[in-house]
């Protein structure tokens, strides 16, 4: 393992098998997520889906934060991520991604939304920066005015 430096830090997650079909991943702060199934058979999120969750959460947090700085806070926002996954060979990696941003807000300015998305994609979202090495990330957005 390489050393931590002032410009590099290790992140940690611990994943424990529940003895059946589930795995609980926990971070040092105590946050957790279920992969597989819980002991009652209820489905959790799959490991590959967690990559998509990470991308949606990372870019979503960036976009809202940037818009808030521009005094353009959406009333509501959803981020939908699709990953195109190989199925014919192992490992079954993602080769392309599509991110769709849905934002609700009568006062949102298209220019500010576009700039927030661009800044997230090109500068701030570490998950996107990592996944972009696996394949291109395309994005679209819609502003819903009610």
Question: What kind of region is each of these model predictions?
Answer:
Residues 1-53, 64-146:
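Extended beta-strand/beta-hairpin segments
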